[in-house]
């Protein structure tokens, strides 16, 4: 039915805030997960949003640098659209600076209110980066009551990295094999009362995190404004009838 005009209404909700922090370095293109680590991650994130209720989500992507791809929002449709566009080209500097990514995510939550929502960071990476301040960043997050759940994607055996049909090689001309690095991810989770989960081709591990989040204490989220359309069906019908009546009267005058 036709809808015209709009109105705004405020909706109070209770839930948690979650920042997804996704590794988009070239090593995430390794194919020990199908079709590769990054594409498998994007698929899992898409499904994650289907399992959330009144929670708010944001997205940080990182490699050697970190970028807020999506600020905290309750619009899951928008979040899905942004997550589907994730690619290594979003970050100009290659590498895996987990510390910078965690620091940026920590600063990207909304401000606390009187009854703040629980805050969670979900870090998805193959863990190949150096420490580079990651533990310190995790400890700072813990001081603010933020829990970090880490998901390791990849296999201990690893896989080569293919870009544009060619495999990446090192300075010696040997093929680079990217392997899952778990110790750092375990330490980050332990520092924040979170948990580390090793992904498999069957399950990235986000389902387990959703179950944990759903059992967390909820807090007040900022009032959300939704734009709604007013039903105008009856007015359009009325206008159409008036136009038809005028046309009938004009024709009647022309044909006495």
Give each language-model segment a name.
Residues 1-10, 215-256:
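C-terminal signal-anchor/stop-transfer transmembrane helix together with its immediate cytosolic
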Residues 1-119:
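Membrane-embedded segments
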Residues 22, 60-63, 124-127, 151-154, ...:
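Active-site-proximal beta-strand/loop segments in catalytic clefts of secreted hydrolases
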Residues 29-31, 68-70, 129-134, 158-161, ...:
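Extracytoplasmic/secreted cell-surface and envelope-processing proteins
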Residues 75-78, 166-169, 214-217:
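Short, hinge-like loop/turn segments at secondary-structure boundaries
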Residues 92-96, 107, 112, 117-120, ...:
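VWA/integrin I-like adhesion module and closely mimicked acidic/polar interface patches used
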Residues 185-215:
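Extended, hydrophilic extramembrane loops/domains of integral membrane proteins
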């Amino acid at each position: 039915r036709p809808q015209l005009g709009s109105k705004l209404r405020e909706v109070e909700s209770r839930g948690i805030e979650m920042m997804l922090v996704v590794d988009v370095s070239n090593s995430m293109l390794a194919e020990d997960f199908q079709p590769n680590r990054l594409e498998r991650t994007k698929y899992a994130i898409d499904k994650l949003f289907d399992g959330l209720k009144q929670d708010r989500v944001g997205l940080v992507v990182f490699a050697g640098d970190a970028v807020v791809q999506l600020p905290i929002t309750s619009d899951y449709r928008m979040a899905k659209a942004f997550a589907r566009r994730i690619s290594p080209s979003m970050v100009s500097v290659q590498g895996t600076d987990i510390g910078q990514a965690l620091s940026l995510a920590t600063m990207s939550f909304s401000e606390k209110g009187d009854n703040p929502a629980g805050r969670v960071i979900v870090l998805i990476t193959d863990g190949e980066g150096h420490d580079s301040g990651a533990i310190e960043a995790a400890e700072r997050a813990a001081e603010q009551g933020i829990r970090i759940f880490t998901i390791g994607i990849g296999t201990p055996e690893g896989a080569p990295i293919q870009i544009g049909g060619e495999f990446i090689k090192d300075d010696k001309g040997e093929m680079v094999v990217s392997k899952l690095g778990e110790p750092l991810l375990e330490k980050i989770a332990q520092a924040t009362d979170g948990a580390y989960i090793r992904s498999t081709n069957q399950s990235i591990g986000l389902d387990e995190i959703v179950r944990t989040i759903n059992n967390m204490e909820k807090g007040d989220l900022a009032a959300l404004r939704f734009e709604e359309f007013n039903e105008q069906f009856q007015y359009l019908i009325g206008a159409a009838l008036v136009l038809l009546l005028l046309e009938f009267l004009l024709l009647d005058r022309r044909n006495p």
